Amino acid sequence: MAQIFNFSSGPAMLPAEVLKQAQQELRDWNGLGTSVMEVSHRGKEFIQVAEEAEKDFRDLLNVPSNYKVLFCHGGGRGQFAAVPLNILGDKTTADYVDAGYWAASAIKEAKKYCTPNVFDAKVTVDGLRAVKPMREWQLSDNAAYMHYCPNETIDGIAIDETPDFGKDVVVAADFSSTILSRPIDVSRYGVIYAGAQKNIGPAGLTIVIVREDLLGKANIACPSILDYSILNDNGSMFNTPPTFAWYLSGLVFKWLKANGGVAEMDKINQQKAELLYGVIDNSDFYRNDVAKANRSRMNVPFQLADSALDKLFLEESFAAGLHALKGHRVVGGMRASIYNAMPLEGVKALTDFMIEFERRHG
């Protein structure tokens, strides 16, 4: 079978080695004669999986000891509600920075629970989409927390700055599409959350990192399944967790550690992004409308000079083993999502195709 490279924004490509191991263990896991999907989440065998996954995740991100790691349901959208329900306390407002589609979605959900102070960070610089630097973000004095999304998958916009708003500002961030792709200083955040389906594992699992002093403040109306304290007190097993997604994510963590960890992923991701953006920038046939300072290394949207060729580009790229390149309906064009599991070889195959397609149709 020809090599297939999956550029889907999520659920996304998983490491080939991880899929191979999961395939080998599917019907007889851990010598039990059953699948990991069939064992009790409270049995000692799966408890070991859960504990190892948390330890490896903590190691990869150097999570400080005063932070709890929760393995949850609900995805990023679940956390759009969970953050205000857990962190507001007796306050009625929170700061929300709007830099794209997912930040705006979080704001919409937050309005059910508080009065968000929304700061629109989107700007245009020399005709390109960009984000105002953090020093220009206008925060309020009475906010319970400040929320932002460091990587906008649809817009192809990234905010790579590290928050530095002082110890009194609780920073909550949606890292769904950039978690584990580069080092981050967890201590600068109060809450970090990430859906698994991009850089962690299969859809169905969400990981939350929460500073322990923020526990115990949940609104009385907060559903128990979203209550950080309840999840923490029950070892993320208040109800039956998505065990297979948890297991597979644990395999991904071990794969990351075996391949140099987050620091090495950071280097490779930079190489992949430079290669792809380089082809786009050196061409009049392709274009990307995001300012270089805010370009995402995970999600690269691009347009063809002649949109009439979009359908042909997608058909021929798919036939060449380059899958899921269609852009999101909101922005159109193409989008290549190049998360950790996408090898440099895959991006090279894409850029070779792009160069050849331009030669034939430019």
From Swiss-Prot:
GO molecular function: O-phospho-L-serine:2-oxoglutarate aminotransferase activity; pyridoxal phosphate binding
Main location: cytoplasm
Binding site for L-glutamate: S9, R42
Cofactor(s) the record lists: pyridoxal 5'-phosphate
Record GO biological process: L-serine biosynthetic process; pyridoxine biosynthetic process
Residues with PTM N6-(pyridoxal phosphate)lysine: K198
Positions with a binding annotation for pyridoxal 5'-phosphate: G76, R77, W102, T153, D174, Q197, N239, T240
Binding note for cofactor: Binds 1 pyridoxal phosphate per subunit.
E.C. code: 2.6.1.52
Superkingdom per UniProt: Bacteria
Gene Ontology cellular component terms for the protein in this record: cytoplasm
Record keywords, A-Z: Amino-acid biosynthesis, Aminotransferase, Cytoplasm, Pyridoxal phosphate, Pyridoxine biosynthesis, Serine biosynthesis, Transferase
Compartments, record wording: Cytoplasm
Gene3D superfamilies in the cross-refs: Aspartate Aminotransferase, domain 1 (3.90.1150.10), Type I PLP-dependent aspartate aminotransferase-like (Major domain) (3.40.640.10)
Reactions listed under catalytic activity: O-phospho-L-serine + 2-oxoglutarate = 3-phosphooxypyruvate + L-glutamate; 4-(phosphooxy)-L-threonine + 2-oxoglutarate = (R)-3-hydroxy-2-oxo-4-phosphooxybutanoate + L-glutamate
Alphabetized CDD domains for the sequence: PSAT_like
Classification via InterPro entries: Aminotrans_V_dom, Aminotrans_V_PyrdxlP_BS, Pser_aminoTfrase, PyrdxlP-dep_Trfase, PyrdxlP-dep_Trfase_major, PyrdxlP-dep_Trfase_small
Pathway listed: Amino-acid biosynthesis; L-serine biosynthesis; L-serine from 3-phospho-D-glycerate: step 2/3; Cofactor biosynthesis; pyridoxine 5'-phosphate biosynthesis; pyridoxine 5'-phosphate from D-erythrose 4-phosphate: step 3/5
Similarity annotation: Belongs to the class-V pyridoxal-phosphate-dependent aminotransferase family. SerC subfamily.
Function: Catalyzes the reversible conversion of 3-phosphohydroxypyruvate to phosphoserine and of 3-hydroxy-2-oxo-4-phosphonooxybutanoate to phosphohydroxythreonine.
Subunit structure: Homodimer.
Name of this protein: Phosphoserine aminotransferase
Native source organism of the sequence: Escherichia coli O17:K52:H18 (strain UMN026 / ExPEC)
Taxonomic lineage of the native organism: Bacteria, Pseudomonadati, Pseudomonadota, Gammaproteobacteria, Enterobacterales
